[in-house]
Amino acid sequence: MSHVAEEDELGLDQQLAGLDLTSRDSQSGGSTASKGRYIPPHLRNREAAKAFYDKDGSRWSKDKDAYSSFGSRSDTRAKSSFFSDRGGSGSRGRFDERGRSDYESVGSRGGRSGFGKFERGGNSRWCDKADEDDWSKPLPPSERLEQELFSGGNTGINFEKYDDIPVEATGNNCPPHIESFSDVEMGEIIMGNIELTRYTRPTPVQKHAIPIIKEKRDLMACAQTGSGKTAAFLLPILSQIYTDGPGEALRAMKENGKYGRRKQYPISLVLAPTRELAVQIYEEARKFSYRSRVRPCVVYGGADIGQQIRDLERGCHLLVATPGRLVDMMERGKIGLDFCKYLVLDEADRMLDMGFEPQIRRIVEQDTMPPKGVRHTMMFSATFPKEIQMLARDFLDEYIFLAVGRVGSTSENITQKVVWVEEADKRSFLLDLLNATGKDSLILVFVETKKGADSLEDFLYHEGYACTSIHGDRSQRDREEALHQFRSGKSPILVATAVAARGLDISNVKHVINFDLPSDIEEYVHRIGRTGRVGNLGLATSFFNERNINITKDLLDLLVEAKQEVPSWLENMAFEHHYKGGSRGRSKSRFSGGFGARDYRQSSGASSSSFSSGRASNSRSGGGSHGSSRGFGGGSYGGFYNSDGYGGNYSSQGVDWWGN
């Protein structure tokens, strides 16, 4: 210990002597070469600094935890390595040995945690020499980032039964479905990331969508939320990008860089209706682009656009965006869609319901995006009524219509209870339910209005319950904090408005309570789908009274279809409402007629193929031969889908998020 202290002391004396004109000779061993040399104050530390940078021949340390992705500086320290000459022998720190910039791994966030301020730093993959490398080869792993991306997830307990979900594909020359991920060539990077996510085998939608997308066919897919839709399009798209490389987009990026370098040309674009859903898809993209040169980015409203622009400027190959913010970015000249090969519209019906059709048409038809037939387009949603399918004609070319499970139905994994509760008794009944539920269970309570959410949260708080709430008027930060409190169990009760029905990607919600029932059955389906996700068991309780008569028949049909207990009073009300209204009992929602489960092109003779993912007895034929009690009028599905439920082995993978 004393020896070290002496060395430190001596080293300090030597450094001080270097600044002392009178004692330089004695400290430098009597060297005459340095005698009397004057060093101006502003230059006195330059030699020491240079020695630090150059002592191992690489300026910044080669250690994997180097300080910043701006890494080194040139010999003259005039500019960062971002603008430095990529050739020559000059070092770029930890990026030197790898011939790339700050992407040790997925999601473009660098080699460490994936979100640190250093890892997000300056080097852009577009400006790197990565195009000279084979994009299909994985980059070195990052243990820290791997832990961050793949440590969570619960695959559920009832996956086996979901191999039997029936599927129908409509269109010409439908590619055969797969039974395992290894049945289709997706490359080393994708297969490695599938293993890291602990996905054992594809869900029904993935079994059929992956080979269709790999064959570069346009696709319209109807599948329930939580069924693995996100991976169904991300896996084949990323696989193709790894195989094909950046192509002309990289050349355009470099050419644009000569004049300021700020416009990005993504290869793939994913449009989502809400910011929460966009973030969810982005997080999945980070997983599947781990150890690749693909850099995913996300842009959405309600957040600092300046930060999003700075993130884009570091490079963007796969962009996830909400329509409004994307139009803003395009008008600012930050995004160009000239070389977009893959377009995905996720929750397409939701986007149209929210009024995004003008923005979507502006993006797809009125800008520089390649036309249909040149680009590859996919639409995913839980519902696709005929009206939306007709709109899809403008975006899709010779597409395959894929329906997996009964679109709009619920899973048998969810136990549904409907109880008659007068409006004045709802709060008292809710307290009884909460008291009967385990303290560690996550409970989601749906109400109809923002004011109702705040009021109910305040009531529960004063009753001594740890709770929080979300609705459309909350800021992005408040919503994220509420979700974090709920997920972590600090506030195991979450009160949410209807805008949250398609959100909340939380794998362990045990109980969904419809404090206020929605006005249409599709909203009900999406709400109770927050529990019983991907193979787990769940409970949904709904408070019913005279205000909810309009959905009586639909609710009855849904309960019967899912083999749930039906209260006798509900059957009587449905019977009375059916004849009193003089109708078939269907509510007048825009989705009436089968939840979009029928391909409208079948009326003009389009071909179809029917598959079963499991037992042969469940492989009913397509066409129109099977009617159903839901009054679908002999459509191509009718009774084609049974009520076997729907699941998968993916818990953190669903694409449905709460949002506005």
Swiss-Prot record:
One Pfam family recorded for the sequence: DEAD
Residue(s) carrying Phosphoserine: S80, S84, S89, S101, S182, S455, S592, S603, S610
Residue ranges constituting the Helicase ATP-binding domain according to the UniProt record: 210-402
Ranges of biased composition (kind: Polar residues): 24-34
Enzyme class: hydrolase
Chain positions with Phosphotyrosine modification: Y103
Motif DEAD box per record, residues: 346-349
Tissue specificity remark: Testis.
Keyword Membrane found: no
Residues recorded as bearing N6-acetyllysine in the entry: K55, K117
N-acetylserine modification, residue list: S2
Enzyme Commission number: 3.6.4.13
Cross-link (Glycyl lysine isopeptide (Lys-Gly) (interchain with G-Cter in SUMO2)) at residue(s): K214
Segments of skewed composition (Gly residues): 621-632
Chain residues that bind ATP: 199-206, 223-230
InterPro entries xref list: DEAD/DEAH_box_helicase_dom (IPR011545), Helicase_ATP-bd (IPR014001), Helicase_C-like (IPR001650), P-loop_NTPase (IPR027417), RNA-helicase_DEAD-box_CS (IPR000629), RNA_helicase_DEAD_Q_motif (IPR014014)
Keyword DNA-binding among record annotations: yes
Bias (Basic and acidic residues): 44-66, 93-103
MF terms in GO: ATP binding; ATP hydrolysis activity; DNA binding; RNA binding; RNA helicase activity
Residue ranges of the region described as Disordered: 1-117, 598-632
Bias (Low complexity) ranges: 12-21, 602-620
Catalysed reactions listed for this entry: ATP + H2O = ADP + phosphate + H(+)
Family: Belongs to the DEAD box helicase family. DDX3/DED1 subfamily.
Name by which UniProt lists this protein: Putative ATP-dependent RNA helicase Pl10
Organism lineage string: Eukaryota, Metazoa, Chordata, Craniata, Vertebrata
